[in-house]
Amino acid sequence: MRVAIVENTRITHHGQVGVALHEAAALIDIWRPWSGQPLPASPDADALVVFGGEQSAVDDHTHPYLPALAELMAAYTALDRPVLGICLGSQLLARAYGGDNHLGVALEFGWVDVSLTDAGRADPVLSQVPQTFPIFQWHSDTFTLPPG
């Protein structure tokens, strides 16, 4: 399996997601559009992971690649290929499907326990993590779920 990873800032790396992908013998392509590297024009991997960054999901004027990234994420899902959006990545995925991005309204910083839903327990990836596990959050933006 080939997985495309998008890193949206020089300080955000694939970390434990990369470790898990390496352990699964996945081939990894890393895209760094923040550095000027162009994104692929269409889905060219089996799955896509989009990480966070300090920008908001609507900072098109300072990060002009964001609309193309949202479109690329939608193109992956249109082909029924998995997409994982983390932090900014989840905000961009919501944007791609018509969700509204809300800036500076969800001030959340620190460790918080996350629990899997029934769908999470049935997921082939998430089913491998504990029912409840700690994550570190550091954000102030959020989004509404897209229609449907």
What are these regions (language model features)?
Residues 8, 108, 139:
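Histidine-centered active-site/metal-ligand motif
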Residues 50-123:
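Cysteine-nucleophile active-site neighborhood
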Residues 2-5, 27-30, 72, 77-78, ...:
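Amide-donor transfer/coupling interface in amidating biosynthetic enzymes
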Residues 12, 19, 110, 132-137:
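Helical cap/lid subdomains and adjacent loops of hydrolase enzymes that gate the active-site channel
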Residues 38-43, 92-94, 144-147:
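Short loop/helix-cap segments at secondary-structure boundaries that form the rim of catalytic
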Residues 1-79:
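N-terminal beta1-alpha1 cap of cysteine-dependent amidohydrolase-like domains
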Residues 43, 107, 131:
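Structured loop/turn residues at beta-strand edges in well-structured enzyme cores
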